């Protein structure tokens, strides 16, 4: 996520898995979107110091809080499992908090789904199309950015369960051409600790994507942008959110699965998980019905409709599409390991520090103060899908913009405010992005990608390169 402050409109506006672009503000943001493709680790996904200025007293922040301002005396307390009962009063507080974030951030529309043992919450706010004023609706399809990484990681782990690959095998045993591949393991790629330079931080990539959002990239072309740079760190030594890792894992899935990555993920993950509204696109077409997505990752920095931009630049790091109901279901399936052997899921859940307090990253998922899952951001869209195991509760949200608010991913702000009310002892929190996300806007691939620290760029990353990152 870029920390650069961008002009905001007075009216709501609606991904950016890749995140900011190069030196010019518009390009910088565009690059961020591509890199973002992260989701939850939006702050971590940034790779560089923030050059933007934040308001002295922002009304909304993503800072952790023991209690939300809207969760005061007289409100029901969290039960032993960590979530509050969804009483009419709590529901009203959630409505008010979501409306407040929607208004203050200028997000066009958002879908929010919550499932707890004591009740459910499924509501839409704002508009799905700023031109027609069509209301946002839970049935609509939106791009999910870096949530895609959770599907790619699951596909790899299905191959582990089938005995076709080992997590500690060198990637060179399966994928040719990876610099230093003999010393980089499959596990390190999934944990964002390969040390490779992220392709979505390369200025040439960012410029190509921002100036031609319908450009069709091949996986090898994407990786080539990163491979021309030296490694950022030795394998296994530091966390750096990096879309390149998940493009390489996509190639591994194709090699061992014997099918195009999207087809394998559909057959081995989407279908077994019974996600009837989730898909891996092969072009820029959106399945109907869908919400339009809005971004400022453009050459001029002007807001544009990114709905049908080609997601090939994000591929297995952030190209997928889903609905809020499917994300609710997927968050539980992913966090509980329903598609994997228990021992394999246990390996996936071994999270390591990211540099952000309370946030650890495992094999294609994070633990954010107890919430297990991921976030995503790419030009036009952002998402969060997380599960709180001890409370058997799920939170999923989707919004149709990736435009940052005072340096923060709007999806993180919604999740933060919601969990302050829903689970005050487990508040979802990601610091504002420092400069540019480490993945193109996406998600997902939104959200989260740290460098040497979760919010800063690795010391070895060229300073001129950090702002030219696209989020995913």
Locate the predicted segments by residue.
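Alpha-solenoid HEAT/Armadillo repeat architecture
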Residues: 103, 176-179, 254
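Secretory targeting and sorting signals
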Residues: 1-51, 58-61, 65
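Active-site donor-binding loop signature of nucleotide-sugar glycosyltransferases
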Residues: 125-127, 296, 399
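Catalytic loop of the DD-peptidase/beta-lactamase superfamily, centered on the K-T-G motif
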Residues: 46-123, 266-267, 307-472
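Hydrophobic/aromatic residues within well-ordered alpha-helical segments
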Residues: 90, 94, 148-151, 245, ...
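Active-site SXXK
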Residues: 98-99, 112, 118-120, 141-168, ...
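Short, surface-exposed loop or secondary-structure junction motifs
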Residues: 122, 184-371, 375-379
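Active-site-proximal loop and beta-strand segments within enzyme catalytic domains
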Residues: 88, 116, 125, 129-241
């Amino acid at each position: 996520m870029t920390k650069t402050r961008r002009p905001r409109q007075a009216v709501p506006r609606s991904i950016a898995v890749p995140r900011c672009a190069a030196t010019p503000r518009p390009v910088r943001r565009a690059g961020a979107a591509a890199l973002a493709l992260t989701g939850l680790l939006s702050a971590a996904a940034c790779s560089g110091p923030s050059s933007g200025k934040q308001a002295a007293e922002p009304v909304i922040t993503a800072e952790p809080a023991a209690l939300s301002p809207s969760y005061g005396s007289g409100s029901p307390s969290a039960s032993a499992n960590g979530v509050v009962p969804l009483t009419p009063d709590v529901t009203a507080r959630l409505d008010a908090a979501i409306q407040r974030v929607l208004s203050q951030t200028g997000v066009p529309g958002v879908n929010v789904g919550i499932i707890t043992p004591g009740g459910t919450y499924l509501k839409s706010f704002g508009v799905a199309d700023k031109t027609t004023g069509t209301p946002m609706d839970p049935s609509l399809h939106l791009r999910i950015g870096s949530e895609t990484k959770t599907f790619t990681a699951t596909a790899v782990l299905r191959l582990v369960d089938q005995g076709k690959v080992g997590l500690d095998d060198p990637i060179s045993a399966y994928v040719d051409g990876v610099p230093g591949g003999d010393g980089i393991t499959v596990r390190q790629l999934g944990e964002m600790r390969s040390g490779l330079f992220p392709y979505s931080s390369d200025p040439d990539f960012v410029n190509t994507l921002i100036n031609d959002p319908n450009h069709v990239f091949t996986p090898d072309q994407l990786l080539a942008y990163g491979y021309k740079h030296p490694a950022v760190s030795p394998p296994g030594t530091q966390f750096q959110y990096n879309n390149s890792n998940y493009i390489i894992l996509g190639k591994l899935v194709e090699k061992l699965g014997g099918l195009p990555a999207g087809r394998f993920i559909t057959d081995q993950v989407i279908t077994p998980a019974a996600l009837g509204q989730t898909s891996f696109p092969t072009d820029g077409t959106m399945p109907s019905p869908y919400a339009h997505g809005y971004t400022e990752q453009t050459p001029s920095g002007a807001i544009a409709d990114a709905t049908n931009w080609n997601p090939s630049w994000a591929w297995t790091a952030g190209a997928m599409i889903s609905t809020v109901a499917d994300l609710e279901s997927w968050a539980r399936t992913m966090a509980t390991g329903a598609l994997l052997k228990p021992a394999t899921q246990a390996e996936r859940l071994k999270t390591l520090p990211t540099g952000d307090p309370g946030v650890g990253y495992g094999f294609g998922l994070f633990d954010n103060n107890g919430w297990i899952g991921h976030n995503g951001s790419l030009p036009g869209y952002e998402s969060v899908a997380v599960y709180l195991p001890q409370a058997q509760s799920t939170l999923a949200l989707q919004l149709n913009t990736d435009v940052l608010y005072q340096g923060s991913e709007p999806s993180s702000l919604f999740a933060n405010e919601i969990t302050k009310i829903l689970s005050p002892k487990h508040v979802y929190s990601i610091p504002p992005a420092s400069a540019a996300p480490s993945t193109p806007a996406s998600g997902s691939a939104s959200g989260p990608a740290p460098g040497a620290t979760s919010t800063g760029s690795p010391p070895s990353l060229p300073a001129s390169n950090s702002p030219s990152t696209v989020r995913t």
